């Protein structure tokens, strides 16, 4: 959907290193949002993606709060948010 509206997208995905053990092979503070999307007119968005019952961790909240304090637009999006996501990406 983001590509349809010409957003540049960076999606960080975890890798399974052994059964039940997942890591994201990035350096830096833990909890950085899953998506960073940039559009030359529509701005920059940081997004934490969660499953329907997924819980935002304390380290993820630390990043969300730090980014918001810095004036960034940050969202936690779930599958139920599809209409809201579509509207934001189109505006």
Locate the predicted segments by residue.
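Catalytic phosphate/metal-binding cores of nucleic-acid and nucleotide-processing enzymes, i.e., regions
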Residues: 1-91
């Amino acid at each position: 959907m983001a590509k349809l509206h010409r957003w540049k997208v960076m999606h960080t995905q975890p890798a399974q290193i052994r059964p039940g053990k997942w890591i994201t092979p990035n350096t830096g503070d833990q909890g950085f949002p899953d998506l960073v999307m940039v559009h030359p007119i529509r701005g920059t968005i940081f997004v934490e993606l969660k499953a329907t019952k997924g819980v935002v961790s304390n380290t993820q909240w630390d990043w969300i709060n730090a980014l918001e304090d810095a004036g960034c637009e940050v969202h936690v999006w779930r599958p139920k948010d599809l209409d809201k996501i579509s509207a934001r990406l189109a505006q």
